[in-house]
């Protein structure tokens, strides 16, 4: 699919007003559609929603999980894999396109692996490697921070746990850029990178990040997503507040990160920041950036009881702006956008 402006697609979402009876929905505009544009969202009830941006249909998948956080859709397998907090593992659901769009369907996993995770948070996929963060306080000491990263492999028979590494900080969101894994250092304004992550860390052991960089103006990093040179970071601010969240957009991210010394920070003037009461950002726990539409999708956990938000013109907007799309989804925990 060619490069498009997101506002051309919003009109298709007029039909989506049936998604919820909440008057909070704000979906309008003219539309020219093509290809596939599916937004997947997990929830803390275990339901997965798929919003068809072109048609306005919403499909509800009732999974075996009762709490999910993290999702990846594989067009090759016509399946999605979610991180199950209730099942403490991964679950894959197949033949997704075989169900009628707009239906509510009960699913059983094609295969799963359970029992390893304690408090899973995010999922990053590279080839047949499925990498999951876990922010469990291993020593139950609030003065010492640690987290874990679980590395699974997937084949036609299911998942296998290859190894688990322990980080020297609480870890939340993760994102691959090439072979390097970037991770949000929870409770800080920092991002860490592990170079050649999958090949350098094959054993169960404590690992040290190759570099940690702070971002000026950011309070508490939670989600991150990278595409075509642009990194979007979500800032939940104070966890108890539902109106102090923000998004930080960093263009030419790799060069700015490389130019900053470990322990240093990327200046505010090298970022775009979306924040303020008009944004409806309180606790943006997960984000997806799509460069074709130049849009940011946000899983907003607290404002309005839980919402999915979208911001148009992502690489040029800044300040206290209203989202271009908003609708209520209680318990939303992560989002994934598939387009072609």
Across the structure, where does each feature detected by a protein language model lie?
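Conserved beta-strand positions in repeat-built beta-propeller and related beta-rich domains
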Residues: 33-34, 39-45, 74-75, 81-87, ...
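A short beta-strand motif characteristic of beta-propeller blades
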Residues: 56-64, 103-114, 158-165, 203-215, ...
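Bacterial Sec-dependent N-terminal signal peptides
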Residues: 1-46, 53-55
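A short loop-to-beta-strand structural motif that recurs across blades of beta-propeller domains
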Residues: 47-49, 67, 89-94, 145-151, ...
